[in-house]
Amino acid sequence: MKLYQKKSYSLIVLLFSSFLLISCKNKLKKPNNQERINRLISYVKNKEGFNYKIIDTIKYKGANLYRIKMSSGEWMSDKVKGESNWQHWLDIAIPDYIDTNKSLLFIGPGSKYDDEIYLESLSIEKAIKTKSIVSHISNIPYQPIKFISNDTIDRYEDDLIAYGWNKFLNGGANDEDAEWLLRFPMTRAVVRAMDVVQEISSTKSKPVNSFFISGASKRGWTTWTTAAVDKRVIGMAPLVIDLLNIVPSFEHHYRLYGDWSPAVEDYVNYSIMDWMNTKEFKKLLSYVEPYEFKSLFTMPKLVINGTIDEFFATDSWKFYWNEIPEKKYLQYVPNGNHGLLGSYQNQNIFSFYERLIYSKDLPELEWSIENGSFNIKVEKNIPHTVGLWKINNPKSRDFRIWEVGRNWEKKEIGTSDSGIYKIDVPKGDGYTASLVEIVFYPDSDSPLTLTTGTSISPDKYDHQPYQSSLK
């Protein structure tokens, strides 16, 4: 912009230019992702239909477990058969001695027919050890659900989610249809669970005021969306939802396998993949895709994935990791499929959680994969071990469990006083997958395991891109 040189005009010109600039910006303003996330925020704030009741109190040595039946709200009452008010079991472990206002909430699966306690004994033990309240909400999403329109099928999990996506996309991706996206009521249910935990703890010595949340698979996705809409979330551990930046991630998926994995069959059945790169699909993602509002995730994050996942390629991290804000920590579980390996990941979550709530330093770890090497820098003077994990598939670039089994192998790497490591990316016949694992405080009762992303060598495709059937 050319500036006027006459001093007498400069202030007037500056003010007038600023006014024009602001006016133009307002006129040109278009719906953006902040407006879409605001719709989700508004949705979860609605407490219509919300209520809860304490059903039982179970005494453990060192803690009480509250069993609560919670209704999180109505969903599609004019379109579903039977109960449209989502029902959940919320189990809350309250230790006899509480030393923090922070709390851990697990987001779990289940069905409306279940009534067992999902909060495992390890969680109760950790509540006592960390002197913090630990809870678990089940039946996320509420399921099964039948729909009125000639539906005789009990819909669960991905079939239920894909059904709603299909309705939204084929209906023109209108704003008023956003509730079809099941992440809306799933996120609302978790927010209501936090409300209940706060109310139950309000009479305790340290009432809960913030949460660390964790869930797996579609509950992992809901972990992200809950963190985006509720400021009470001060940390999170989403598990096995290795698909942020979903379009390039799934384009990658197809070029690796030449087909869609059976694990995503429900989405294939509704032709969801054909909608990728359409304006309708972009609209869908703007509502519920964490990558679309990634700037909101400034809280500490421990992202846990499996290396032999049935749903996601083991190097999917590269489509989102570098763009996610700090502080962020990654763990790929060697030989971990979509269900991971039992307590392996939970122990790591508790280690991370304990360090976070008591303001213990989280280890500094920098890593990159460049020029055929893992380049790693570990903070000095922190006890740690280093290992290189690898697996080979001589036939194809496919590391799903049914192709390679649980055959990742580990090689110990000697520790360096400098904390700096340069480790060659392994190669072999066909394709080789590898990662570097660093275990911090290995001799303590709460070690913390972190890894680099997975590297695949050679980095090339065997198949052509997916061709949508939509015209």
Task: List where the protein language model places each region.
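Surface beta-strand/loop "capping" patches
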Residues: 351-390, 409-418
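Hydrolase active-site cap/lid region
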Residues: 225-274, 331-334, 340-344
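Gly/Ser-rich "nucleophile elbow"/oxyanion-hole loop immediately N-terminal to the catalytic nucleophile
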Residues: 172-188, 192-217, 233
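Short beta-strand element of the alpha/beta-hydrolase
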Residues: 89, 101-110
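Serine-hydrolase catalytic core
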Residues: 280-334, 378-386
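Cap/lid segment of the alpha/beta-hydrolase catalytic domain
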Residues: 111-112, 134-191, 243-256
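Catalytic-loop region of hydrolases
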Residues: 29-99
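Short amphipathic alpha-helix adjacent to the substrate-entry channel of hydrolases
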Residues: 117-135
